[in-house]
């Protein structure tokens, strides 16, 4: 999403506020580096969209693709990606305090819960 204005918040939002991107970054901050592991942390995200988001994050310098095996690359956060850690942490804390909608049955996923407590 482009805001079309020179504002640091708008520029940051163009990168990290795309749908699913904060969850992808959070999953990578938790240690996932392989596509399949990142995907496991965001199971409702399509593989196509995850691939697109990783390539976008690579293009803007938030992640980098590494690995000798091109069929199983590793995705690593760059210094810029790691700098998002407090942002993601505070976003989660804000959600705990202020996103008070009642939990719906479809919000609960045992697979995601178990993956996140690893």
Describe the role of every protein-language-model region.
Residues 7-48, 71:
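N-terminal helix-turn-helix DNA-binding core of bacterial DNA-binding proteins
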Residues 17, 69-90:
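Basic, amphipathic "hinge/linker" alpha-helix immediately C-terminal to the N-terminal HTH DNA-binding motif
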Residues 53:
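Residues within the DNA-recognition helix of helix-turn-helix
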Residues 61:
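Glycine-centered, phosphate/nucleic-acid-interacting loop/turn motifs that mediate DNA/RNA or nucleotide
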Residues 65:
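Short beta-strand "wing" residues that participate in macromolecule-binding interfaces
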Residues 86-118:
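Amphipathic alpha-helical dimerization/coiled-coil segments
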């Amino acid at each position: 999403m482009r805001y079309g204005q020179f504002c640091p918040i708008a520029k940051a939002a163009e990168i990290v506020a795309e749908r699913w991107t904060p969850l992808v970054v959070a999953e990578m901050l938790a240690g996932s580096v392989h596509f399949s592991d990142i995907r496991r942390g965001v199971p409702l995200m399509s593989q196509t969209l995850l691939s697109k988001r990783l390539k976008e994050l690579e293009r803007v310098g938030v992640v980098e693709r590494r690995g000798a095996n091109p069929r199983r690359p590793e995705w690593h956060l760059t210094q810029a990606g790691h700098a998002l850690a407090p942002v993601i942490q505070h976003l989660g804390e804000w959600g705990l305090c202020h996103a008070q909608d009642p939990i719906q049955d479809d919000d609960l996923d045992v697979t995601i819960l178990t993956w996140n407590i690893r």
